[in-house]
Amino acid sequence: MPGFELFGPEEKQEVADVMEHGFTFRYNFDHMRNDRWKTRDMEQLLCEKMNVKHAHLLSSGTAALQTAMMAAGIGAGDEVIVPPFTFVASVEAIFMAGAVPIFAEIDETLCLSPEGIEAVITPRTKAINLVHMCGSMAKMDEIKAICKKHNLVLLEDACQAIGGSYKGQALGTIGDVGCYSFDSVKTITCGEGGAVITNNTEIYDNAHMFSDHGHDHIGKDRGAESHPIMGLNFRISEMNAALGLAQLRKLDTIIDIQRKNKKAIKDAMASIPEVSFREIPDPEGDSAGFLSFMLPTEARTQEISKKLAANGVDGCFYWYVNNWHYLKNWKHIQELKAPAALPITLIADRPDYTQISVPKSDAIMSRTISMLIKLSWTDAQIAERIENIKKAFAQ
């Protein structure tokens, strides 16, 4: 990853198709299109590739998260369990839905742990926002059992994990509803874009209406459509979908390359005594966008992070100090900072986010580095990278 490394004539042709007829709106205006529907085509291909009943494209992964929550009935005052290690959008979307983020511990899958989830469930818990971080999955069997036991909605945030699977089932399709992101640095890209996927027709209907001001999309006269519900504008454009359609056709190739490149580096690093690797519940389903490894101590991890950079090993993320991916660095979240008061401020007994403690997660993330796996590496570049990694550890 990212998918833009494989941009080529296929993407140019799909975008040119849209420019030829000149209409970028995803709905209606059939007479102007010459039967060209890039958004519909990408949605249909997503359904086929993920073996899921419904897919709905949106303007971003964040839009997909908020739409999925609203479509699944998650709203005012509902508690949603979320990990402290995720992109901040996973939490912001909960706030914007009027719900209450509840942070739970992760384990060495780098995803929510079953024990962490159980520890924070209350009578107000409505859903789990299960984030498949860095391309791989959580302990799905155990977490699905928890959802069944407590009657919880399972939302899969697979924004970083398209192309991954668990026991042969695509990540994002295992829970009640799933989300993908197609921003500029994801496994495949629309430039900006996202998707909601589900086998639940009610959730799908809510999603496509909510993301287009409540339009029911029945008939061919947009102005005559009904508005069964309120909503917002999270529509994707045909230009973005055209780019994404070409990229989606390359997904299998992208995953194959990532897995090959990751294996070469992981095999080489396995001989380094102080290195251990992230737990992956189904290794065959790893999308391989990152190689995440752990070191014995926080101090050693900080040292190696600096030495990798000094030796030219780029794309290595020490998330523990990253401003966008770990709870302890989100002062704006902890202090509920926004341009105006958020719905959660109306809840008297809301969590004090300045006092959230996740010691197990801290112990894991302070010792974890994730290495981005690129598509464009040649065999020679991979060999050079391996040598530079070994140099960093030997110094």
Curated annotation (Swiss-Prot):
It is an enzyme of class 2 (transferase). Its cofactor is pyridoxal 5'-phosphate. Keywords: Aminotransferase, Lipopolysaccharide biosynthesis, Pyridoxal phosphate, Transferase. InterPro entries: DegT/StrS_aminotransferase, PyrdxlP-dep_Trfase, PyrdxlP-dep_Trfase_major, PyrdxlP-dep_Trfase_small. Disruption phenotype: A double kdnA/kdnB deletion mutant shows increased sensitivity to polymyxin B and bile salts. Pathway: Bacterial outer membrane biogenesis; lipopolysaccharide biosynthesis. The modification N6-(pyridoxal phosphate)lysine is found at residue 186. GO terms for biological process: lipopolysaccharide biosynthetic process; polysaccharide biosynthetic process. Its EC number is 2.6.1.109. It catalyses: 8-amino-3,8-dideoxy-alpha-D-manno-octulosonate + 2-oxoglutarate = 3,8-dideoxy-8-oxo-alpha-D-manno-octulosonate + L-glutamate. CDD domains: AHBA_syn. It comes from the Bacteria. Gene3D superfamilies: Aspartate Aminotransferase, domain 1 (3.90.1150.10), Type I PLP-dependent aspartate aminotransferase-like (Major domain) (3.40.640.10). GO terms for molecular function: pyridoxal phosphate binding; transaminase activity. Signal peptide: none annotated. Belongs to the DegT/DnrJ/EryC1 family. Kdo8N is found in lipopolysaccharides of members of the Shewanella genus. Catalyzes the second (last) step of the biosynthesis of Kdo8N (8-amino-3,8-dideoxy-D-manno-octulosonate) from Kdo (3-deoxy-D-manno-octulosonate). This is 8-amino-3,8-dideoxy-alpha-D-manno-octulosonate transaminase. It comes from Shewanella oneidensis (strain ATCC 700550 / JCM 31522 / CIP 106686 / LMG 19005 / NCIMB 14063 / MR-1). The gene is kdnA.
